[in-house]
Amino acid sequence: MTILAVAAGFAADLAFGDPRWLPHPVVAMGRAITWAEGRLRRAFPQTPAGTRAAGLVLAVALPLACGLLTWGILHLCGMVHPGLRFVAEAWASYQILAACELRRQSLAVAHAFSKGGLVAAREAVGLIVGRDTSVLDEQGVARAAVETVAENASDGVTAPLFYLMIGGAPLGMAYKAVNTLDSMVGYKNERYIDFGCASARLDDAVNWIPSRLSALLMIAVCPIVGLDARGAARIWRRDRRRHASPNAAQTESACAGALGLRLAGPAVYFGKLVEKPTIGDASREIEWGDIARATRLMLAASVCALVVFGAARAAVVLAVGAMA
């Protein structure tokens, strides 16, 4: 039942994406984080240790609450009718996955350039990256879009599928809460260096396995989408650790090698130049078509993840059933 529900949610995500008018659980999570942050900061001592403790409470409480709430809803739906539980789990899976939205927002950058030039493209890419886009040239904008697809292939699709297949919608929603916490408070700036410490470390931990599986799946599907599997494997082995995060360079290095591009490197954040190592080799100049190539790679790896993770769950269920 869970496998079919997740597959239905995945299909719905590819078909419909995230309509702006539809309420989304991530928005609710964001509001809960904002609400809880102020109260937790006031409830704990105003010291580094106290602030870290407050952040730890939030890092544990929100994913647990989201998972339990989802489990409760599914349980109530199941008491009414098994079919209603299936629909609810498929709906939750649809809300958790972000393949279509990642594709739409990245391709919108190239579309903006074709319609409005560099200024429009900078504005479009500014919606999906945290760096200062006003200083980017054409190649810089295209590179930022490709990097976004590569970095979020795991967080937005593969990792949610991984946890959905392990623990259904409750575990998938708990993962989404961890991911949302990291995106909101997992920064190493003055405000969040202590409060966001637990959230950032938890996000690193839960993404450790999925990010590596995502990179391997990207390499595996390269021949299907006409990209360089050998190059992807070579650059992944060489550059997968070239990032401050233990996970971010996994998929980025595989994508860079598959496309024959050099990604990452120095970038401007809040008016300051941040030095970061490059990933990949500049076998050729980046072009606007690389955004579409990166999205095809992401989508192919996502479908592969659905099949592989679903088959693994089915095998475990059958094995457990045979032992019973």
Walk through the language-model features, giving the residues of each.
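Hydrophobic alpha-helical transmembrane segments
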Residues: M1-A174, V178, G186-A324
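Solvent-exposed interhelical
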Residues: S183
